Amino acid sequence: MAYGGILNDADITAALEACXAXDSFNAKSFFAKVGLSAKTPDDIKKAFAVIDQDKSGFIEEDELKLFLQNFSAGARALTDAETKAFLKAGDSDGDGKIGVDEFAALVKA
């Protein structure tokens, strides 16, 4: 798993189960449940690198939609509403994508 050494598998499973229903995803509670909120800035940057699939230095809307699948291949895609809410919560400079510093701020929020 891409998060080996950063996150605990049991925490990942619990966090994914908590948002298994469509439109139940909340970034802040997910980051807390999965244990990312308590991690070091370095570990948060490593997590960002996993989510940034195209290695552009940003997490774009299409990568956010598939966010949960970074934690488990069988996880659902986020709904359009969840994706837009996630982007709005993390995109503090309004450029339509989430940079590493914005991601770290969202995780720690």
Curated annotation (Swiss-Prot):
The keyword Chloroplast does not apply. Residues 39-74, 78-109 form the EF-hand domain. InterPro entries: EF-hand-dom_pair, EF_Hand_1_Ca_BS, EF_hand_dom, Parvalbumin. The modification N-acetylalanine is found at residue 2. Keywords: Acetylation, Calcium, Metal-binding, Muscle protein, Repeat. Pfam families: EF-hand_7. GO terms for molecular function: calcium ion binding. CDD domains: EFh_parvalbumin_beta. Ca(2+) 1 binds at residues 52, 54, 56, 58, 60, 63. One of its GO terms (cellular component) is cytoplasm. Ca(2+) 2 binds at residues 91, 93, 95, 97, 102. Belongs to the parvalbumin family. In muscle, parvalbumin is thought to be involved in relaxation after contraction. It binds two calcium ions. This parvalbumin has an isoelectric point of 4.47. This is Parvalbumin alpha. It comes from Cyprinus carpio.
